[in-house]
Amino acid sequence: MSKTAKSVKAICRKYDKFLCVESPDSNALLFPSIAVSSFRKPDIEQALEKLLEITNNDELAISRQLAKGQSTNPRYYLCYCDYEIDFLANGQRAIWLTQQEMAYHKWIPEDQKMADLVMSPLFEKSPYTTKTAVQLRANDAVGRTLEEIDFNNTEKQGNKSYPGNVIEHVWFDHPADNISAPDFPEAEVELKVSPIDIKKSKDGPSCIAGERLVLNTINYAKESTADFRTSSFWKKNRFIELMQYLRRIASEKGQSEDKRKYKIKYAHLLAMDDFAEPNFPQNSLLSLSEATMLRIEQDWNTIHQFIVENRADELTEGMTDTLAACTKGANNKQKSKQSNGARAKSRAYCFKQSFMTSLLQNYASDVHETTSLIKDIKQLQNRSCDSIILDYFNPFKGKSFTEIAEQFHFTIPKNISPKQTNFMLVDHMLGSNTSISKDPNDDYVSFDAEELKGIRVKTLPLFHGKPSEQFKVQSIPDFNDLINQKWDTDNCALHQLLETTKFLVFVFDNQNPNEKDKNPENIYFKGAAFWYMPASDIDIAEQVWKEDVE
């Protein structure tokens, strides 16, 4: 092998056994290896999967790099297999040995040091092998600031991942890795650290999620052959240790702050599946309802359909409600291969910010009940959430304002605006069991129903079938702020809104002789529809935005 040749070796683990092979030149053992074109993460993953004959339906959990060799540049990677393979791709017989059994064998000189490390009784002995152990450790962090946890200042405060690094590297003493299995494989628990912001309003302060919860990166080629229960999303995130810290007053975003003062406020196990650990602290458990799980699975199916059809370049966060596919990378420009070889923007699964806020408010506020528009959750087994909600409005299509008001036995007040009239009627169609929140800039309203969290509700007025006003999505911010924004970053408010937002649009047609005439007898409800901006239209909006900024 030339000096420039590169190779990787697999320290492959299945429970208490490790994968070894016999050297063709002697009776000594070695760790299986394969040549790689580069030490880039995708090349390493592809090579190890080929070596260990991992198919698209089987997830090889590749953990951290353990060591680097000298002459031939082998790099050792800890891997976790779903099952014990019998043969490698090159035909070599697989030998599975415990640490004690490994000690009775001779090893090739190149692998002797690594074998000694693996045979050590302390090798990869995590104290967090159960969900209970992870949770108890997480609970001990509640009430502490990041400064109190990382009192030696080992983590860089300027790093965007500083809070997560402090919890993972310092508090849990967990090494940095990019593993496709959960962070604590034996416990099947993924660790996530997420901010809480305080939102002030006339009704008093309330806690909101500071951002979406970004989960694992989507491998389009692999995910195209999976179903929900075999997907990387399910394997990685079935159980999430969610640790949340108080960050800031939401309106103070952008001001200088000392991240070391962030304080851990909550620690919960977000469980999407059942588990049996009788000593687990039940007050730390967040179990998702059947309805929520069905909505998450529907969202996954929506994303999956685009992946299967090699249309990942058309994905946006706005097309789903709870689980979404968000852009991945510092400038949102990274590309990943689809199953047909075409490249699309790299994306990761994420829980939307509105869903995270809804979860948070279940235990951070005194109000624990949320209105649901879906009365029979069995409907979600064969119908989309959107279609069920639209059923509330379909019976009123084609009816005038007066007819709708008469059906609900009320009279439309004469001293309210047309927009107020519109939403009053919408509220009655929904059964008058939701509350309406109005945007300060009058851009949209939102309903507090569980299924409409995070959805912007807009009206589209027509005059004899033609739009009578523009579809306003956002007020123009301060111009000095605008010129400092960059489209492909999180600080571009318009891009974030178009990429992440789903709208519920109500169409009303004014059939009066004069557009200013608001006689309710001649204004008709034409219907409702959910809408998000397609990726192709977002690209057009980008060009217009850049021209305006320049």
Per-region residue spans from a language model:
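Nucleic-acid endonuclease domains
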Residues: R93-A94, P121-P185, E190-E550
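Active-site segment of metal-dependent pyrophosphate-handling enzymes
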Residues: A5-K6, E45, E49-I85
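Conserved N-terminal beta-strand and adjoining loop/helix that marks the start
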Residues: M1-L19, S37, R75
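Anionic group-transfer/hydrolysis microenvironments
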Residues: I11, P24, Q100, K192-S194, ...
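Conserved Nudix-box catalytic region and its N-terminal flanking loop in Nudix hydrolases
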Residues: R13-T55
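Short, charged/polar surface micro-motifs in flexible loops or helix N-caps
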Residues: Y15-F18, S26-N27, C81-I85, P195-D197, ...
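A generic fold-level signal
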Residues: K3-A5, R13, S71-T72, A89-G91, ...
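Nudix hydrolase/Nudix homology domain
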Residues: S26-L29, Y76-L78, D86-S126
